[in-house]
Amino acid sequence: MRETAVIVPTYNNPKSIKKVAFDVLQNGYELILVDDGSDDVVEELFEDGEKENIYFVRHTTNQGKGEAIISGVKKAKELGYKHVASIDGDGQHLASEIKKLTDAYKDGEILIGARNFDLEHVPNGSKFGRWFSNFWACWDTGFEITDSLSGFRIYPVSILNLPIKTSRFDWEMEVLVRHADAGRVISEVPIECYYPTADERVSHFKKFGDTMAIVWVHVQILPFKWPGFILDKLLGRKRK
């Protein structure tokens, strides 16, 4: 099978998406561009001569980031790929950093590109939200996770077999939990990012609504895990 395709899920990112796409292509990867119901059809933003090595997938209505990634993974599997690198369409993630992940990747795992939030130029955002998400991601999966909200990841195509019920930003949390429940590994490598100005960046993450959706993922899952996790913590056991 082929090794790594790159998926870029996008929804109303007309200012950045072509630059992101060309960055991926210039770094030698085939691109699966998933248009999650954008107002302007993403494929129509590209001239015919610009479409080489790009596979366009379009949702006619907005279905959420999780569904966009799943559609991209299905396309990658159809093309014969074993795993995919997923990066965001807002320009924050650098295609040149994908090699860091592919070099470190081990078959079957989910590998997260972890951002360094201690750098001076990194926006403050919600420090509590990041801490909260990371705490429960570690608790739910048994793995040390420092950037559970990072959209820069490598996924194996086997995630298509996981019983995931969410479809939007909360999907990125649930896929980690379900993957760990299946006995698979989650790892991280540090990455560098570009942080666009407020005028440049288009974000569809709703701080309250999407954060509550992520919380709800844990609320539904945790009651079934408390006895085993408490025992693991008391005995100092870690999931391998």
Per-region residue spans from a language model:
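Acceptor/aglycone-binding surface of glycosyltransferases and processive sugar-polymer synthases
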Residues: 55, 61-63, 67-78, 95-169, ...
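Donor nucleotide-sugar binding loop of glycosyltransferases
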Residues: 13-16, 38, 65
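Short beta-strand/loop segment that forms part of the nucleotide-sugar
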Residues: 21, 29-38, 57-59, 87
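A conserved acidic beta->alpha catalytic loop
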Residues: 35-44, 91
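Short loop->beta transition adjacent to catalytic acidic/histidine clusters or analogous donor-positioning motifs
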Residues: 2-4, 24-33, 53-54
